[in-house]
Amino acid sequence: MRRLLPFLVLAVIPFPATALADGCPPASCGIASTAPPGSSIVFVRTGGQQGPLQAYDVSSGARRFSLPAGVLSADGSTFVSSAAPQLTRTTLVRYDARTGKIVRGWSLRGRWNAVAITASGRHHALVRYGRREVSLRVAGRRAVLPASFNVEGLSPDGRKVFLVHWKRSGYDLQQLDLVTHRLTATRLDDPDEKMTGTAVNAVATRDGHWLLTLYSKPDGHSFIHALDLRTGLAHCIDLTLTGDFFALGSTALTLSPDQATLYLANPYLGRVMTIDLGKLEVTRVVRLSGLSVDNVNALIGPSAALTPNGRMLAFTGQRTVWLYDTAYGIVRQGTQVKTSITGVGFRPSGRQLLVLQRHGPPAFLDAATGERR
């Protein structure tokens, strides 16, 4: 596998708003939300995918709690933050992401960053960067690598660390076994496949099986890089979704409640795509009359949510929210609110949709029709 820029290269360092002007896609650096199906809260990341987290109640729209910059487990249970108020020590805190309460706090000598976490939240990766080397800590195990490595993700048991190896001629993906300390190249299911692109968004399955990353190719085409976190084998899923870097970077990636389906929704490119994760192939493409690509808002990333039964998908763009019927492949007419949308989430009943606005009170829509409630 050659010339892949993985998702966590974009997420290792929290991006300030000024980074958006330097070419960071809205999905990685803009304000966006996630809402596990059936959850009572919506998570809004206000400074990129490793930025501060705000949790909102899906029934009232009220903010429940706020957490500092850190990493959130895919199942929505655990949040780990790191801060170095002193140059010589780092304070680390593990939170229950469902309540915002502290589970544990501790400190380490040196300056460490929390950069990855397993889907269950059981294990997390810490890195300490030096001029010539990078130190890793995962579940009590340590390793030291040249400074040309970045962390991409973790296997469910925390034994393997998936890495990006930077070279003068580009970069490749490798994996480190923390027990044997063996470093090997990440294998591709098709050895002859060559993928070139830049990561613009990613999502991990809540069962710890897949890390699914959307890549933008230099020619405007795109593909999904599906990394099996259990076996370490990578797969490529070619897409018919085409557009420039920022348009593709406004694609929302959402998983079905049973983790068997990945939905890609992009109102700027006018597409909703369905991928069967069992077959690793696109099974449906639906068109919609969406927004102009000239109006991509780099400060506001894409948000999406599914009802607990997986029937309705809500996705956003600027001030508009659309509802997609996953059973019939129908996109409902978009509903507009007064200001930019920063998050969406369905109530556990699946009958109402909470819409969070950047400037303004929360709105509630009927989950079937999109009408205001």
Task: Enumerate the predicted regions with their spans.
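Repeated scaffold domains used in trafficking and secretory/extracellular systems
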Residues: 26-35, 66-77, 109-120, 147-157, ...
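Beta-propeller fold detector
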Residues: 64-69, 103-108, 142-149, 183-190, ...
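Bacterial N-terminal signal peptides
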Residues: 6-16
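Short coil/turn segments that connect the beta-strands within blades of beta-propeller domains
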Residues: 38-40, 76-77, 122-123, 157-159, ...
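Structural core positions within WD40/WD-like beta-propeller blades
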Residues: 41-43, 79-80, 125-126, 162, ...
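An edge-strand/N-cap motif at the start of beta-rich repeat modules
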Residues: 21-65, 72, 76-77
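Short loop/turn segments that connect beta-strands within beta-propeller blades
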Residues: 58-61, 96-100, 137-141, 177-181, ...
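Short glycine/acidic-enriched loop and turn motifs that connect beta-strands
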Residues: 47-50, 84-89, 130-133, 166-170, ...
